[in-house]
């Protein structure tokens, strides 16, 4: 539903963002546009050089926690192209393509590697920003380069994967290039000599699986564990799994011997954030209409027409409680957008 904002000079009809992000919070923006070609992207950037705007994919990793005072621009470029050499398939996908549909497309055309990343919501353009990952695989291993438009110069650039500063749910697009680049496409390399990755969780029980077997199991597990955002508003995992030193883990194990962990290297481990949150009794708790999901503590949901303020309140309560109990700082994975842009907990 639109909202009317009135000032001394004019009446402005604000655009509702509720259906444009999967959390479904009641927020609005000053204007909304859908960018469907590189040409229209250049035009939009030229017209908004001195105006605030926020770039959006499918809104699956974004929560609008207040009315945004600017234009929201949906990056909706489409197209998939495939080339190959002796060792790899070279896949060029436009930023507005659905990530899951790209996974399905590649599987259908016997180009394997993406199957562990099935059913991750969002667009191709969002994948490198977040360095999406699941079940032992992160998308960075397949990215050759990312094509983007510099929002200051309006010029197209291509940045190699090695320069993207990929990390755990992290990249240069969240830091040095945050709000400075519009991703328009991504080039992937899928090896022809495919090797399954089945070291994580339920996949470890698969015996000599095909790529289709892995895809099927990932879809099955994700559908069982995670609420469907089209039914129950959410943005998937709200917090990142924290990474701590082995020395810190040893100290924590003195007090919490059952704390699970996953070794990353000889010096660091990853702790499941869901376990930390569950230990503190947040699973199933409400803050107004926002709820910590009763089956998966890492997912916050819009259970009963919640608001952005309620989401921030519950997220901060969880973050502060984890810090107090475990001396671990939880970072939120979801992009929180307020009136003037990014909001931090």
Swiss-Prot record:
Signal peptide (residue range): none
Enzyme class: oxidoreductase
Molecular function GO terms recorded: FAD binding; UDP-N-acetylmuramate dehydrogenase activity
Superkingdom field: Bacteria
Pathway the protein takes part in: Cell wall biogenesis; peptidoglycan biosynthesis
Enzyme Commission code: 1.3.1.98
Active site location: 169, 237 (proton donor), 333
Domain FAD-binding PCMH-type: 25-193
Keywords in alphabetical order: Cell cycle, Cell division, Cell shape, Cell wall biogenesis/degradation, Cytoplasm, FAD, Flavoprotein, NADP, Oxidoreductase, Peptidoglycan synthesis
Reported cofactor(s): FAD
Oxidoreductase in keyword set: yes
UniProt catalytic activity: UDP-N-acetyl-alpha-D-muramate + NADP(+) = UDP-N-acetyl-3-O-(1-carboxyvinyl)-alpha-D-glucosamine + NADPH + H(+)
Annotated localization: Cytoplasm
GO cellular component, one term: cytosol
One GO biological process term: peptidoglycan biosynthetic process
Key word GTP-binding present: no
Family in the record: Belongs to the MurB family.
PANTHER family cross-referenced by the UniProt entry: UDP-N-ACETYLENOLPYRUVOYLGLUCOSAMINE REDUCTASE
HAMAP family assigned: MurB
Role: Cell wall formation.
Protein name: UDP-N-acetylenolpyruvoylglucosamine reductase
Organism: Pseudoalteromonas atlantica (strain T6c / ATCC BAA-1087)
């Amino acid at each position: 539903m639109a909202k009317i904002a009135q000032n001394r000079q004019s009446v402005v009809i604000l655009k509702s963002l509720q259906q444009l992000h999967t959390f479904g919070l009641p927020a609005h923006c000053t204007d909304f546009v859908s960018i469907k070609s590189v040409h229209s992207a250049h035009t939009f950037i030229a017209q908004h050089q001195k105006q605030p705007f926020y770039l959006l994919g499918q809104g699956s990793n974004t929560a609008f926690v207040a009315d945004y005072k600017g234009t929201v621009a949906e990056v909706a470029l489409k197209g998939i192209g495939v080339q190959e050499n002796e060792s790899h398939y070279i896949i060029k996908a436009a930023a507005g393509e659905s990530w899951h549909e790209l996974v399905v497309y590649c599987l259908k055309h016997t180009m394997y590697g993406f199957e562990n990343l099935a059913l991750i919501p969002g667009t191709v353009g969002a994948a490198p920003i977040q360095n999406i990952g699941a079940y032992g695989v992160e998308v960075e291993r397949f990215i050759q380069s990312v094509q983007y438009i510099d929002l200051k110069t309006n010029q197209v650039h291509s940045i190699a994967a090695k320069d993207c500063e990929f990390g755990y749910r992290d990249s240069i697009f969240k830091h040095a290039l945050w709000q400075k680049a519009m991703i328009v496409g991504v080039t992937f390399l899928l090896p022809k000599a495919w090797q399954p990755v089945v070291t994580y969780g339920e996949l470890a029980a698969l015996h000599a699986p095909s790529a289709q077997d892995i895809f099927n199991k990932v879809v099955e597990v994700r559908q069982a564990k995670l609420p469907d955002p089209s039914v129950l508003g959410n943005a998937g995992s709200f917090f990142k799994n924290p990474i701590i030193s082995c020395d810190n883990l040893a100290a924590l194990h003195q007090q919490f011997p059952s704390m699970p962990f996953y070794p990353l290297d000889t010096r660091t481990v990853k702790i499941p954030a869901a376990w930390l949150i569950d230990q503190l009794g947040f699973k199933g708790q409400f803050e107004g209409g926002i709820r910590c999901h009763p089956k998966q503590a890492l997912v916050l949901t819009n259970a009963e027409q919640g608001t952005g303020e309620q989401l921030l309140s519950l997220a901060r309560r969880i973050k502060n409680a984890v810090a107090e109990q475990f001396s671990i700082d939880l970072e939120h994975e979801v992009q929180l957008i307020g009136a003037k842009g990014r909001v931090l907990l």
